[in-house]
Design a protein with these regions (language model features):
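Short, glycine/charged-enriched secondary-structure capping and boundary segments
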Residues: 47, 69-73, 131, 165-169, ...
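Helix-loop-beta segment of a Rossmann-like dinucleotide-binding subdomain
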Residues: 82-98, 124, 131-135, 212-219
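Aromatic/hydrophobic pocket-lining residues that form π-stacking "cages" and hydrophobic walls in ligand
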Residues: 43, 105, 233
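Short, intrinsically disordered, charge-balanced linker/junction segments flanking boundaries
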Residues: 51, 231-234
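Rossmann-like dinucleotide/flavin-binding elements
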Residues: 20-29, 33-59, 177-224
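Glycine-rich active-site loop/strand segments that organize a redox cofactor
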Residues: 53, 64-103
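Short beta-strand to alpha-helix junction loop
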Residues: 88-107, 116-118, 219-230
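FAD-binding core/adjacent interface of flavoenzyme oxidoreductases
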Residues: 1-34, 49, 64, 68, ...
Length: 234
């Protein structure tokens, strides 16, 4: 997974709208970033470096998508491609693990003392360039209102599961995300898919005593399956 290059920080006007005159200064932010993943953090860092007041809001935990990856996942890429903010990412082996990535991004957030509001759902964004209004709700039901000159949407795509749109897909025994094999020991599991995620999940399940059937629509696994995974799955 290669972290996208942060968005360029646009020029932000030095003066605030007149409607802000009677409000507390700390209720305003130059930049509000929606999403506390690697890209969102990188955007906040670049805004902060440019001298702007940035805040990050996320409905989940820090780098929530990485947290939800399979527990024992190892990235396909090397650590330097995951670095942000000029903070070195050192790992025990050639490729970082999920746990190493979580620790790294926590360290980055602490180093830059980023203003991050976790477990806050963005409910509405209104207004216009230079004067946006953002309403959020936290996990306790409290409502918060923010105003910002610029908005960066860095929500990613991990929440958008690949749907088959077939009968039975909404049953309780059907899952679109995989965490670990242990709960499925000595059971029958069908994995649907022909790319890396499906291949790695099927192999992990099989290696932990699960009876696995891998279903994919092609005559063979997709060409995108990594070369070091393919021999074991085929």
């Amino acid at each position: 997974m290669k972290t996208p290059t942060p968005l360029a920080v646009e020029q932000i006007p030095e003066t605030l709208p007149k409607t802000q005159a009677h409000e507390r200064r700390d209720s305003w932010h130059d930049v509000l970033v929606v999403g506390a993943g690697p890209t969102g953090l990188a955007c906040a860092i670049e805004a902060q470096r440019a001298g702007f007041n940035a805040i990050v809001v996320d409905k989940g935990c820090l780098v929530n998508s990485i947290f939800r990856y399979p527990n024992n996942m190892v990235f396909f890429t090397t650590p330097e491609l995951l670095e942000i903010g000029d903070i070195p990412f050192t790992t025990a082996l050639a490729k970082p693990t999920r746990l190493e990535a979580l620790e790294y991004y926590r360290r980055v957030a602490e180093h830059y003392e980023l203003d991050i509001r976790l477990y806050e759902w963005v409910k509405t964004i209104t207004g216009e360039d230079g004067d946006f209004r953002v309403t959020t709700t936290n996990r306790h039901g409290a409502i918060h209102d923010y105003r910002a000159r610029k908005i960066v949407v860095a929500t990613g795509y991990y929440d958008l599961a690949n749907q088959l749109n077939i009968p039975g897909e909404d049953l309780g025994k059907v899952f679109h995300y995989y965490r670990e094999a242990h709960p499925y020991f000595d059971t029958d599991v069908v994995v649907i898919g022909g790319k890396n995620s499906a291949a790695e999940a099927a192999l992990d399940l099989w290696r932990h005593g699960v009876r696995v059937t891998l279903v994919h629509r092609g005559a063979q696994m997709h060409s995108h399956v990594k070369y070091w995974v393919r021999p074991d799955i085929e």
